Amino acid sequence: MPKAVFGGGCFWCLDAVFRKVDGVRDVVVGYAGGRRPNPNYEQVCTGVTGHAEVVEIDYDENTVSYDELLDIFFKIHDPTQLNRQGNDVGTQYRSIILYLDEEQKEKALKKIEELKKEGLNVVTEVKPLEIFYPAEKYHQNYFAKNPHQPYCMYVVAPKVEKYLKIKNENKKT
């Protein structure tokens, strides 16, 4: 199974959205892109580890392509915000694509160039995945387990709804 690794704000949001994508087999939230080995949530939140909150997506490429995952990624977060998404501020919330091979790198850079040609000042970082550290168990599939938690209601749920609206519009065309 191929994998994709993206970061774009709180990993609960990306996790909840990508779990709704046809062809996605599993999503694991975690940390990547930094220096400290075996980081935990509290350390990552301080910003000193250099890690971003990310999702590792296990997908069936016969159902959904890496390009389609990139499209979804760029539609559900703001790639023009440096080190933040909305009220979540810090390097751990940066927009980042961690590629697993040269093909993913080329596709990510091509997509960013397309967005820049549309006038977006994309600040998404693109770098090779060195190591992915799964987050603590309580973070996994957080939205499904805590839909009435205020952050989930006011931040995560709207992103899921945005994706579902896009998905339904694409089915109509």
From Swiss-Prot:
Its EC number is 1.8.4.11. One of its GO terms (biological process) is protein modification process. The keyword Oxidoreductase applies. The active site is at C10. SUPFAM superfamilies: Peptide methionine sulfoxide reductase. InterPro entries: Met_Sox_Rdtase_MsrA_dom, Met_Sox_Rdtase_MsrA_sf. Keywords: Oxidoreductase. It catalyses: L-methionyl-[protein] + [thioredoxin]-disulfide + H2O = L-methionyl-(S)-S-oxide-[protein] + [thioredoxin]-dithiol; [thioredoxin]-disulfide + L-methionine + H2O = L-methionine (S)-S-oxide + [thioredoxin]-dithiol. GO terms for molecular function: L-methionine:thioredoxin-disulfide S-oxidoreductase activity; peptide-methionine (S)-S-oxide reductase activity. It is an enzyme of class 1 (oxidoreductase). It holds the Pfam family PMSR. The keyword Ion transport does not apply. Has an important function as a repair enzyme for proteins that have been inactivated by oxidation. Catalyzes the reversible oxidation-reduction of methionine sulfoxide in proteins to methionine. NCBIfam families: msrA (TIGR00401). Belongs to the MsrA Met sulfoxide reductase family. This is Peptide methionine sulfoxide reductase MsrA. It comes from Nautilia profundicola (strain ATCC BAA-1463 / DSM 18972 / AmH).
